[in-house]
């Protein structure tokens, strides 16, 4: 397994990331105002460091998007948008499903899918005319765990407990394991 397989994309600058965050917040606000009766799902990847995109990261992203679409197959989807900027992949979906129910489905998906941990599956609502993310802990879910030490991810991030190199190595191992397991099941399906 080579880390470069997963982190082979274009390096970005902090200013690019800040601009992308601002644009994402504006897009979320616009969608929430355009679809006031719907629930907004905003999907991005948790990728540390200056490289946010690569063919393998896109493959993982698209697998999760397909899983989301499958999980919501019985619900009305009003709008979808998939963006592929170098600052990180983005996906937006508006559904008629109540936001609480949507968040519960996304928590389940994030937990069931081995690469779900790489995603931010944010369900947003308008609060005081601004996008507000529904927290998994408000719905009884446990806080996200760190890829490396299994402690609370926000604490590790705030303290910069792990280097970018450590986190990229952990993500590479997770993806390598996922893609190899997936290929093995595809091979056994064909031979069986």
Swiss-Prot record:
**Biological process, per Gene Ontology:** prosthetic group biosynthetic process
- Which Pfam families does the protein's record reference? CitX
Documented EC number(s): 2.7.7.61
Q: What Gene Ontology molecular function terms does this protein carry?
A: holo-citrate lyase synthase activity
Superkingdom, taxonomy of origin: Bacteria
| Signal sequence coordinates | none
List the catalysed reactions: apo-[citrate lyase ACP] + 2'-(5''-triphospho-alpha-D-ribosyl)-3'-dephospho-CoA = holo-[citrate lyase ACP] + diphosphate
Keywords attached to this Swiss-Prot or TrEMBL record, sorted alphabetically, are: Nucleotidyltransferase, Transferase
Which family, according to the similarity comment?
Answer: Belongs to the CitX family.
The entry's function note states: Transfers 2-(5''-triphosphoribosyl)-3'-dephosphocoenzyme-A on a serine residue to the apo-acyl carrier protein (gamma chain) of the citrate lyase to yield holo-acyl carrier protein.
Family matches, as HAMAP family? CitX (MF_00398)
Protein name, per record: Probable apo-citrate lyase phosphoribosyl-dephospho-CoA transferase
């Amino acid at each position: 397994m080579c880390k470069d397989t997963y982190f082979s994309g274009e390096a970005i600058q902090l200013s690019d990331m800040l601009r992308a965050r601002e644009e994402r917040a504006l897009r979320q606000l616009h969608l929430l105002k355009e679809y006031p009766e719907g629930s907004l799902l905003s999907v991005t990847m948790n990728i540390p460091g200056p490289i946010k995109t690569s063919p393998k990261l896109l493959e993982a992203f698209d697998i999760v998007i397909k899983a989301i679409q499958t999980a919501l197959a019985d619900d009305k989807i009003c709008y979808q948008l998939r963006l592929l900027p170098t600052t990180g992949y983005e996906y937006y979906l508006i559904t008629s499903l109540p936001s609480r129910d949507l968040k519960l489905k996304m928590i389940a998906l994030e937990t069931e899918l081995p690469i779900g941990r790489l995603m931010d599956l944010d369900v947003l609502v308008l609060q005081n005319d601004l996008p507000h993310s529904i927290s998994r802990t408000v719905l009884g879910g446990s806080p996200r765990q760190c890829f490396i030490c299994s402690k609370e991810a926000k604490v590790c991030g705030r303290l910069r407990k792990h280097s970018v190199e450590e986190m990229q190595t952990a993500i590479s191992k997770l993806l390598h394991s996922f893609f190899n397991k997936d290929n093995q099941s595809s091979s056994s399906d064909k031979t069986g």
